[in-house]
């Protein structure tokens, strides 16, 4: 171990000077990512888009690249560029220039208009940024009003241009006190009505693209906190660290089908290597949240003075290892290949700490000798093509299992895969205008598993596309950027969930006899056959970034969420049968049942 640390120290000590920070830029910094995507699609800068979030170091480099190409930018883009160059001033070894500030222009800056405190030492060996976080959102439709509020703070530090440390806390609440008694008759119904991240049944997360949360107890609605952060050792060619952040793998402007970043963030060891312009390696080993109780692992709690004990069961351990190799042979083409494994052992399996590995092969080595059931492995790919400036074509593919024999017409089985394709036309003939379209399909059993603890999920949120198995999603967006800091979006989303199946290898029949579950029969069922849930949403979003990380937003949305009966008599044992209300309650929050016109107004700074 001492030798490894010595080698790392030598490698980082002889590296080139880097005056930036390896701190991730949150995926929900929508305006910044939209601006970077615009510059990339217009051909002003070059960057891979399959793996996010970007670090502040990477973003600063992109902005510098755009600054060198400013003759290709229009006036609005130049103003946006100057705006973000100021936001990333510390990464460029300068001080932030604020409207209302107390500063010496060299080492410290206390900004009041866009609240934050920035500091850097005279030789740039130490940099720090401290920001408050505060926001509120009022959402109203015919079912009443929801009030969301959040507050907290974030701290970012960089030491010796090679060590980044950061952390943040956001306390959130969704209040159902103003929900209509016509739709929510009791206090418990109002609590459930405010918990819009879950279906009305509160059994599973809803099929929506909202970031996932884990609710705490609250007698007014939904309450949760989110603490993120990490520590990273970095240089110009790579970084290694441990962090708790949301990540997204796979090219997408709406929702990725590989790793969407929708599930609550999990702690992970991360490695990123970029030794040359045309190659990038990303790897992580994560501690997932199984939400599956281990009947052999519990705490004993004293419940009476006499010493009576109660068992408090603990969840199973659940881990994930994944890698992604991104190649950019020419500026117009980038493709990524990777694989991952979900495993549940008492401790970390050292084999899955290897960054460059095919994990399914390692799984066979570790489990086949005792004829044990495999862990859950996956493979995936993403491709990005920019044949001309202003046009981006992309696709991503997720494979849970693949057999060539299933491609034959004589074989009724379908490979459990998911694919996504899309395009982005931006900046021509009207500057600032873009058109996006995205289509996704996921086949039966591509994200599920017969062992609950091995599903492709964390905190019960599917880590791939939010629609899950046997589903289809169509997303279109027309966006316009009329002035610095403003983004207007008109979007339409059509989400359809088809027949829902459990992954059963065996099942117990009505007579009590254990029978083959017929997974082969399940994946031989016709995919996309009978819709059981559908949600259509037409949405207009207006967003204005007054100062960096300070937003005013207005959203108008019409949605129509419907369930459909599926009570056939010849169904497989694995199929979930029910009436329209059952599916609507399972997949949709009660607040969005049926037809709704919803208005949302929000203000925030620091997200």
Locations of the language-model features?
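Outer-membrane beta-barrel channel domains
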Residues: 23, 45-50, 55-57, 67-334, ...
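Extracytoplasmic/secreted proteins, especially bacterial periplasmic and envelope-associated proteins
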Residues: 31-34, 38, 58-65, 83
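Short N-terminal segments immediately surrounding and downstream of signal-peptide cleavage
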Residues: 22-42
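Intrinsically disordered, low-complexity coil segments
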Residues: 10, 16-17, 204-206, 295-312, ...
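Exposed, low-structure sequence patches enriched in small/polar residues
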Residues: 224, 328-607
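Generic structural marker for isolated residues within well-ordered, non-membrane alpha-helices
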Residues: 36, 228, 475
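Bacterial Sec-dependent N-terminal signal peptides
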Residues: 1-23, 607
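Short regulatory "switch" loops immediately downstream of catalytic or recognition motifs
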Residues: 10, 69, 288-297, 495-497, ...
């Amino acid at each position: 171990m001492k030798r490894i640390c010595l080698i790392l120290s030598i490698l980082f000590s002889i590296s080139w000077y880097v005056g930036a920070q390896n701190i991730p830029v949150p995926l929900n910094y929508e305006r910044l990512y939209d601006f970077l995507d615009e510059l990339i699609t217009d051909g002003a800068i070059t960057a891979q888009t399959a793996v996010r979030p970007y670090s502040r170091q990477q973003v600063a480099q992109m902005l510098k690249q755009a600054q060198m190409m400013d003759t290709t930018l229009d006036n609005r883009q130049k103003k946006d560029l100057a705006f973000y160059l100021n936001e990333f001033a510390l990464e460029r070894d300068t001080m932030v220039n604020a409207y209302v500030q107390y500063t010496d222009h060299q080492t410290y800056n206390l900004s009041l208009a866009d609240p934050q405190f920035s500091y850097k030492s005279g030789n740039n060996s130490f940099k720090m940024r401290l920001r408050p976080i505060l926001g509120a959102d009022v959402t109203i439709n015919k079912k009443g009003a929801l009030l969301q509020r959040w507050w907290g703070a974030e701290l970012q530090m960089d030491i010796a241009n090679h060590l980044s440390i950061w952390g943040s806390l956001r306390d959130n609440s969704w209040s159902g006190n103003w929900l209509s008694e016509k739709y929510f008759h009791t206090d418990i119904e109002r609590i459930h009505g405010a918990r819009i991240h879950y279906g009305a049944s509160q059994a599973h997360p809803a099929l929506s693209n909202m970031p996932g949360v884990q609710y705490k107890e609250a007698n007014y609605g939904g309450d949760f906190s989110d603490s993120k952060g990490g520590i990273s050792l970095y240089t110009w060619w790579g970084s290694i660290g441990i962090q708790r952040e949301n990540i997204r793998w796979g090219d997408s402007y709406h929702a990725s089908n590989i790793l969407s970043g929708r599930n609550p963030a999990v702690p992970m060891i991360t490695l990123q290597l970029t030794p040359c312009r045309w190659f990038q390696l990303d790897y992580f080993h994560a501690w997932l949240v199984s939400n599956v109780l281990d009947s052999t692992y519990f705490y004993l709690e004293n419940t009476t003075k006499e010493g009576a004990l109660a068992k408090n069961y603990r969840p199973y351990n659940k881990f994930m290892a994944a890698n992604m190799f991104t190649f950019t042979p020419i500026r117009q083409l980038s493709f990524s290949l990777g694989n991952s494994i979900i495993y549940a052992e008492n401790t970390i399996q050292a084999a899955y700490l290897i960054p460059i590995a095919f994990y399914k092969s390692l799984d066979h080595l570790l489990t086949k000798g005792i004829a044990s059931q495999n862990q859950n492995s996956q493979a995936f790919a993403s491709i990005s093509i920019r044949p001309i400036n202003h046009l981006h074509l992309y696709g991503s593919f997720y494979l849970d299992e693949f057999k060539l024999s299933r491609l034959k017409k004589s074989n009724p089985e379908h490979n459990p895969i998911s694919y996504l394709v899309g395009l982005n036309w931006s900046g021509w003939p009207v500057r600032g205008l873009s058109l996006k379209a995205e289509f996704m399909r996921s086949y039966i059993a591509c994200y599920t598993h017969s062992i609950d603890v091995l599903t492709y999920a964390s905190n019960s949120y599917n880590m791939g596309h939010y629609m899950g198995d046997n589903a289809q999603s169509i997303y279109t967006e027309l966006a316009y950027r009329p002035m610095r800091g403003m983004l207007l979006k008109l979007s339409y989303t059509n989400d359809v969930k088809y027949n829902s199946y459990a992954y059963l290898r065996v099942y117990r029949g009505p007579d009590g006899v254990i029978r083959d579950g017929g997974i082969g029969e399940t994946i031989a069922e016709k995919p996309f056959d009978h819709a059981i849930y559908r949600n259509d949403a037409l949405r207009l979003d207006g967003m204005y970034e007054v100062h960096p990380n300070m937003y005013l937003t207005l959203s108008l949305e019409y949605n129509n969420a419907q369930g459909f009966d599926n009570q056939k008599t010849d169904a497989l044992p694995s199929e979930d049968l029910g009436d329209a209300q059952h599916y609507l309650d399972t997949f949709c929050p009660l607040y969005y049942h049926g037809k709704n016109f919803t208005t949302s107004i929000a203000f925030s700074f620091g997200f």
